[in-house]
Amino acid sequence: MAKILGIDLGTTNSCMAVMEGGDAVVLPNAEGSRTTPSVVGFSKKGEKLVGQVAKRQAISNPENTVYSIKRHMGEANYKVTLNGKTYTPQEISAMILQKLKTEAEAYLGETIKQAVITVPAYFNDAQRQATKDAGSIAGLEVLRIINEPTAASLAYGLDKGDVDQKILVYDLGGGTFDVSILELGGGVFEVKSTSGDTHLGGDDFDQRVIDHLLAEFKKTEGIDLSKDKAILQRLKDAAEKAKIELSGVTVTNINLPFLTVGPDGEPKHMDIDLTRAQFQKMTEDLLEKTLVSMRRALSDSKLTPNDLDKVILVGGATRMPAVVELVENFTGKKPYKNINPDEAVAIGAAIQAGVLGGEVKDVLLLDVTPLTLGIETLGGIATPLIQRNTTIPTKKSQIFSTAADNQPSVEIHVLQGERGIASENKTLGRFTLDGIPPAPRGIPQIEVAFDIDANGILHVNAKDLGTGKEQSISIQKPGGLSDAEIERMVKDAELHAEEDKKRKEEVETRNNAEALINAAEKTIKEAGDVATEDQKSKVNAAIEDLKKALEGKDTEEVKAKTEALQEAVYPISTAMYQKAQQEAQQASGEAGSADARGPDETVVDADYEVVDDEKRK
């Protein structure tokens, strides 16, 4: 059976895993790393770069590099411009997914068409739909969208058998934060509540360090660096490195030589010490936000910290000592550390993929919707149909009516959020139901049904009970894409894949040609009298032809001249090999004869003459 890929599509890093022999296995990327930076860029030559190679060139090419695109998933009007072309967040995310898919296929030696992709528990409908669209553009059928904390609990609890446990999952990633309360038992993973912030993560901690460095440099040198993209990229890398180092040491040095040039033309360097205490002070309000979400999640699940059996930390940012201390102080429990926080979510996604593919038995995942769903009613009131933390999939319906006599149609305004006033919530869509027969206000009965599927994506259905007429309403989600747009983007992605393949082939052809030239020149030098002058001149001519072809851009010409050089070198290489073989055999034979004679026997060299063809005649 074909493998289903489990993907943690992260803000700063992504990870992939599959089920192998009943276990979830994290797959390395082409560079050998188990995580891939969620960075996309284009080189100055127009080559698409994804992952570590994109991150490496960001300092010298910041305007053609994009980070943390996940923060903009579901934003209808957000676009990025790379290499003169605009892209949606879905397309950028698809490039990351495409890299993971391609490299998983290369590692496994088989085609992958299906995936389970994780999202923050607090992602709304538009963000989930955008993630699914990104998978489609990358050529993946997304079988399921699951919440990241839930995936982490699967990674933790798969081997825990029938032990009943209540778990708090604290997930602080690069750009998002979630906390979920789950109950495990008998193979059932039931989410009781979830809370979080889709715009809070490790990036925000990095930004505090960047702001500090900018302020310190301005204070000491009187220069504002905040407008220079290349310098900001260097500061971003330095801030991230400092944050990571401060998890293991109490002070770190940020040293960036030749950062800029002063008014007098003298180079300016940055050399600033940052202590862990300073770092914790400048980020304490960010940690306080996570505490608010933990309190809310526990309150919604009707549990107290004392009721918890385990606390799991997920996401690279949870390595910060202040995070560990905060969670431990709040829950009264030491966090469970037997799971790699960078890999737990991908492992959980692979387990869910195994459930869907039939490889994993006796596991049932019951997730919840993170936000209340409802519609706007008379007076701008938000009337809920599905409350937050309702187990999904679920379907709820309610009867509504007209607000005026003989009203021929009603507009239904679909909302997501916790506020009592419609305008304070997020609009998921609007639709109008026409053809209502004339009647006094309050008489027509319009049934509106909300249906949330297992991916947490909303579908709405409306029915006029008076006429029996039923309509399925398709909400145009903010940030969602039409089938035609997805199809166009799929073709664009395929086109890029072909371009990448062609460019790779061109590079390999040129590399092979240059290697052959070096080998041929070495062969000529070492050939001696094994090669005739005619053979040598043919090889030298073929070398010059190939060098000339390499100066141009015609790959086919390079291939042809490479083959010609191979043909010219072949007879010489063959002759050299045969000579070496004969010499080895001769040496072996002489050694054998000497051994047979013993030490006292005289060795007599025989005179011989090489008879050429002319003398034979």
UniProtKB/Swiss-Prot annotation:
<keyword id="KW-0067">ATP-binding</keyword>
<keyword id="KW-0143">Chaperone</keyword>
<dbReference type="InterPro" id="IPR029048">
    <property type="entry name" value="HSP70_C_sf"/>
</dbReference>
<feature type="region of interest" description="Disordered">
    <location>
        <begin position="579"/>
        <end position="617"/>
    </location>
</feature>
<comment type="similarity">
    <text>Belongs to the heat shock protein 70 family.</text>
</comment>
<dbReference type="Pfam" id="PF00012">
    <property type="entry name" value="HSP70"/>
</dbReference>
<feature type="compositionally biased region" description="Low complexity">
    <location>
        <begin position="580"/>
        <end position="594"/>
    </location>
</feature>
<dbReference type="GO" id="GO:0005524">
    <property type="term" value="F:ATP binding"/>
</dbReference>
<dbReference type="InterPro" id="IPR013126">
    <property type="entry name" value="Hsp_70_fam"/>
</dbReference>
<dbReference type="InterPro" id="IPR043129">
    <property type="entry name" value="ATPase_NBD"/>
</dbReference>
<dbReference type="InterPro" id="IPR029047">
    <property type="entry name" value="HSP70_peptide-bd_sf"/>
</dbReference>
<dbReference type="GO" id="GO:0051085">
    <property type="term" value="P:chaperone cofactor-dependent protein refolding"/>
</dbReference>
<protein>
    <recommendedName>
        <fullName>Chaperone protein DnaK</fullName>
    </recommendedName>
</protein>
<dbReference type="GO" id="GO:0140662">
    <property type="term" value="F:ATP-dependent protein folding chaperone"/>
</dbReference>
<dbReference type="GO" id="GO:0016887">
    <property type="term" value="F:ATP hydrolysis activity"/>
</dbReference>
<keyword id="KW-0547">Nucleotide-binding</keyword>
<dbReference type="GO" id="GO:0044183">
    <property type="term" value="F:protein folding chaperone"/>
</dbReference>
<dbReference type="GO" id="GO:0051082">
    <property type="term" value="F:unfolded protein binding"/>
</dbReference>
<comment type="function">
    <text>Acts as a chaperone.</text>
</comment>
<dbReference type="InterPro" id="IPR012725">
    <property type="entry name" value="Chaperone_DnaK"/>
</dbReference>
<dbReference type="GO" id="GO:0031072">
    <property type="term" value="F:heat shock protein binding"/>
</dbReference>
<dbReference type="GO" id="GO:0042026">
    <property type="term" value="P:protein refolding"/>
</dbReference>
<feature type="compositionally biased region" description="Acidic residues">
    <location>
        <begin position="602"/>
        <end position="617"/>
    </location>
</feature>
<dbReference type="InterPro" id="IPR018181">
    <property type="entry name" value="Heat_shock_70_CS"/>
</dbReference>
